[in-house]
Amino acid sequence: MATKVSSITSLNSPHNGSPIADIVLGVVPSWLLPYVSATINGLVGIVWGGSQNNLNASLNSLTTTNAASFNSTTPNASGVKYFSYGSKVTLPDLIQHPLMGVLVPVTGIGGMAKGQGIENDGLVPLSSQKWGTYKGTPSYSFWVTGLDHLEVSNTLSLGEKWFDVRSFWLSMAQNAKSNQ
């Protein structure tokens, strides 16, 4: 693989799984999961376009157990440099984090139960976001209460109010270029 790929960069990826996936699959009854999945898949399709979403398959692959299984059978490729960036919410207020603010405490509790720690972005524990060389989190002003999963990726332009999205993404691109 190293002859074709020099580096891989990830942002807030659940490399060691997400306790939210464990919780949803553990709490939502199996008979209800197809309906919940269809509803969320429909919403995702409306917001981002496309209809090839499969929440149930995604949740299954993102459990802490299945992530551990994947990691044990899929080692890093030699000669490829791995970099990761992450973020966390420092205060789960519903003003800055209207969608993720409710999930931060749940993910924190699940992260503690799974040995992943309490710090998280609303969906992924900070410890699970780290892979290879961890490059850190974006810089933001003192009044910002951290960056959640949607903000750091600037989904629906949610990050632009809270940090310099373009500079952050440019720094990731510059790091990838300098590690070719």
Language-model segments: residues:
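Helical cap/lid subdomain of alpha/beta-hydrolase-fold lipid enzymes
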Residues: 2-180
